[in-house]
């Protein structure tokens, strides 16, 4: 099965208590062909330092912007993504183990669908 590339876009704004766990949930699920774009949307807490330290070690794209809000930040991430599929992950959420693999299976099984939808859980 050929791997389709996936971009994960993570907009970040003042989530120092959560963002490290978000990034950890991505780390072991992506392949080298995938892309992670972490956008610091003008955070005034330690979020910027946390993402810089973590994401640079992973070779992920880190972008600093003035605060524009979630919608514009997501759209900006979409505009610079270079893959077949884009996953918007909020910086206070985590990806369940196996999700990216399951996305790849669906992409292959349904011959590259235009969209993949799934649900989430609160915890």
Feature locations, PLM:
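Nucleotide-sugar donor-binding/catalytic module of glycosyltransferases
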Residues: 1-123
